[in-house]
Amino acid sequence: MLEENFGIVWIMIKKDLAIKFLSISLLFFGNFVSAERFQDDPIKKLNSPITELGFIRENIISDDGVMINYYIKGTDKKALVFVHGYSCSSEYWWPQLEYFSKDHTVIAIDIAGHGKSGLNRQEYSMDAFGNDVTSVIEHLDLEEVVLIGHSMGGPVIVKAANNLGVKTRLIVGVDTFHDLSTEGIGGFARTAVNTMFKLFYESMTEDSIDDFFIDKTDEDLARWIRNDALKSPKHISQGTLDALLTMNYPESLRELSI
């Protein structure tokens, strides 16, 4: 089984909400994945195509007519599926893709509006992002998957897991959300956030990205990530943010069958 390679699995039950949440450490064979080689020259890696790792780049068309880009390495019908976070792309998974593809079939997906996927989605939602992931997995006729989501990719893989049912063996949240007790914002609060984002897009984006880093973060790496986030079209960033803020997390987690 795929999950046998994970060193530690924590299952936390939030009794007050009667929901399940899986928090799984990224430990393989009892050792942390090392990114030291990546950190030696992170910008060179981030600017290099994932195909250099032996991945094949393919795409499908989503239900709403958006081209969804993904990368795959391996032929097993049991796979690790990586989903990036807000304003990111599959390239951000470079060290993990390099490491895990040595022993597993690995897939990395660019959700709509991100990476090399299409920009023509009309309405952004977590359901739509989850459907992007689901569509790739069903297109490849995979039998069993471990879904791994970074940051915003966490709620995206929850949506995908609900679509996939028994095909999903585990969900792995990497630096994703931990306060899942709220149902999402609406009304005035939603309007206020969207208005502020429209008026102060660049400064709000820069401030939020700067909060990602610590004092020891490589300056070139921080600059690359900041500039990459600012390249995203405003309507996509705003639509994605709105999807994040309006998702009903407790309801989605209750639906998990894992």
Outline where the language-model segments fall:
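Alpha/beta-hydrolase fold catalytic core
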Residues: 8, 13-80, 103-104, 143, ...
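Active-site loop/oxyanion-hole signature of alpha/beta-hydrolase fold enzymes
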Residues: 63-66, 71, 108-148, 152
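Conserved HGGG/HGGXW glycine-rich cap/lid loop of the alpha/beta-hydrolase fold
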Residues: 66, 72-116
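Conserved catalytic-core motifs of eukaryotic protein kinase domains, centered on the activation segment
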Residues: 92-93, 117-122, 183-184
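Short, hydrophobic alpha-helix immediately C-terminal to the catalytic nucleophile
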Residues: 94, 134, 158-162
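Short, conserved loop/helix-junction motifs that constitute active-site signature segments
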Residues: 100-101, 253-257
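Flexible "cap/lid" loop of the alpha/beta hydrolase fold
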Residues: 159-162, 169-199
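Conserved alpha/beta-hydrolase catalytic His-Asp/Glu region
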Residues: 182-188, 198-255
